[in-house]
């Protein structure tokens, strides 16, 4: 099942109110996110593919943990649940997701994703256009409401295999790259 979520008035009002408190310290961001794992209080994420039009990220969210209630004012985001069960909240509704369900969030839609499965959840996040610092947090159980995207100090560049890290280069025409795990398989063509 794929659900599409449109922006509502409450998203617009909340974003306008929060924009003035936004901390986007881009000086603490790497030149690129390739071969880095970003550590989060809820788990971790890493880039698996990027070109000038799209960035695709792999997220692992621990059981009972949740991302902040946040939005991306300038980019559309799609989430595909690879394994487990999740709850993706917006201002309008609670969206329960199971393995291979997806949600498409228009620009500036506030949302949070919580892992309901005891083994945590694996998620693919597709962002268009690529811009990791396009982030405004409304609520965060870890105290990051006024913070921008995690900086270099929250990024790992060594022992990436501990996180089952993978990255896809741009495939040649008719080529397909695949990453397989015991819980999922991801391909890019």
Question: What is each residue range found by the language model?
Answer:
Residues 62-64, 72-87, 91-92, 186-189:
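Glycine- and acidic-residue-biased ligand/ion/polar-headgroup-sensing regions
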Residues 78, 91-111:
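Short acidic-glycine-tyrosine-enriched beta hairpin
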Residues 70-72, 111:
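Histidine-centered active-site/metal-ligand motif
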Residues 112-117:
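Asparagine-centered strand-capping/turn motif at beta-strand->loop junctions
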Residues 78, 118-140:
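A short hydrophobic beta-strand segment most commonly corresponding to one strand
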Residues 58-60:
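Short amphipathic
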Residues 1-55, 68, 135-188:
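A short, N-terminal "cap"/entry segment at the start of jelly-roll beta-barrel domains
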